[in-house]
Amino acid sequence: MKFELDTTDGRARRGRLVFERGVVETPAFMPVGTYGTVKGMTPEEVEATGAQIILGNTFHLWLRPGQEIMKLHGDLHDFMQWKGPILTDSGGFQVFSLGDIRKITEQGVHFRNPINGDPIFLDPEKSMEIQYDLGSDIVMIFDECTPYPADWDYAKCSMEMSLRWAKRSRDRFDGLGNKNALFGIIQGSVYEDLRDISVKGLVEIGFDGYAVGGLAVGEPKADMHRILEHVCPQIPADKPRYLMGVGKPEDLVEGVRRGIDMFDCVMPTRNARNGHLFVTDGVVKIRNAKHKSDTSPLDAECDCYTCRNYSRAYLHHLDRCNEILGARLNTIHNLRYYQRLMAGLRKAIEEGKLESFVTEFYQRQGRPVPPLNVD
């Protein structure tokens, strides 16, 4: 992987990730394909929304179908027939979200398989091996996603262990002869001094890109903005920056303003299945009765298949009847909305008009522009 940085506007960056499998224009949003599929979508439909890279879930694909089934097909690209690049998370977030059924040790994490209850162990080395078999174009290190809230002492211990695991991840990744990209993950909760230590330690180890982890886990939005403003300038400018698990459209806008290049989140697909649809002027809850006889498109400014062909009334009808097509059409629209938003941000950065874009984005939604505390 090669990262090319074209231009900046304030702290926002316009560039691209270049892989053997294709080019990803940045800032980029990655749809989430947890089980080897973006829920309800064919790879061709996902590509048609404008997505150039997707995310796969190491933890879930390890449990089902497993490494051996994956290797029978070649890798995850062959298994799911996605032709572009794939980023896989390390499995750390899913393991730590298991709560009481897992035990963290210096060696790794012991837990119960949530499917059948069998005891399982996952460590940095195993995570690197699974992601190698998946053929991931971007591999994420195995870390502990520090929960929120966490006091300073716990966050410090968690961050320090994640640094040790980062070195183990790097060593095993290199030992496998993996020629793809490996990203480090910056931890430290909401504490700037801990984030400083994490960034410094990861840069000393050396990675192809750097993710900001442990945000969007319940902390106030102001804390997320503060940490991004503090951390992003410390990440080497020639490496991509990835904000994990984020988020709402406004979170993408604010991340870009602070220098983030990559995002992922289940929100557009999960919300689509619940009839919660993103449009230029805000949000449409399609199951509300007021849409029952509305013959207008979901978003007159959207060029997606759904908006070009169907009315709000039809989408309302499908949702109320729990028809599968409704969830699919909603997903197509929400994914396209996110890709249109990212394209708009990229164009605004190219033209040096990002803050004008941001102002209009919030005006259309009837909300104030959040403060940006950067030099």
Swiss-Prot record:
GO terms for biological process: queuosine biosynthetic process; tRNA wobble guanine modification; tRNA-guanine transglycosylation. Gene3D superfamilies: Queuine tRNA-ribosyltransferase-like. InterPro entries: ArchSynthase1/Queuine_TRR, TGT, TGT-like_sf, tRNA_ribo_trans-like. Its cofactor is Zn(2+). Binds 1 zinc ion per subunit. Its EC number is 2.4.2.29. Substrate binds at residues 89-93, 143, 187, 214. One of its GO terms (molecular function) is tRNA-guanosine(34) queuine transglycosylase activity. Residues 245-251, 269-273 are annotated as: RNA binding. Keywords: Glycosyltransferase, Metal-binding, Queuosine biosynthesis, Transferase, tRNA processing, Zinc. It is an enzyme of class 2 (transferase). It catalyses: 7-aminomethyl-7-carbaguanine + guanosine(34) in tRNA = 7-aminomethyl-7-carbaguanosine(34) in tRNA + guanine. Catalyzes the base-exchange of a guanine (G) residue with the queuine precursor 7-aminomethyl-7-deazaguanine (PreQ1) at position 34 (anticodon wobble position) in tRNAs with GU(N) anticodons (tRNA-Asp, -Asn, -His and -Tyr). Catalysis occurs through a double-displacement mechanism. The nucleophile active site attacks the C1' of nucleotide 34 to detach the guanine base from the RNA, forming a covalent enzyme-RNA intermediate. The proton acceptor active site deprotonates the incoming PreQ1, allowing a nucleophilic attack on the C1' of the ribose to form the product. Homodimer. Within each dimer, one monomer is responsible for RNA recognition and catalysis, while the other monomer binds to the replacement base PreQ1. PANTHER family: QUEUINE TRNA-RIBOSYLTRANSFERASE. This is Queuine tRNA-ribosyltransferase. It comes from Salmonella arizonae (strain ATCC BAA-731 / CDC346-86 / RSK2980).
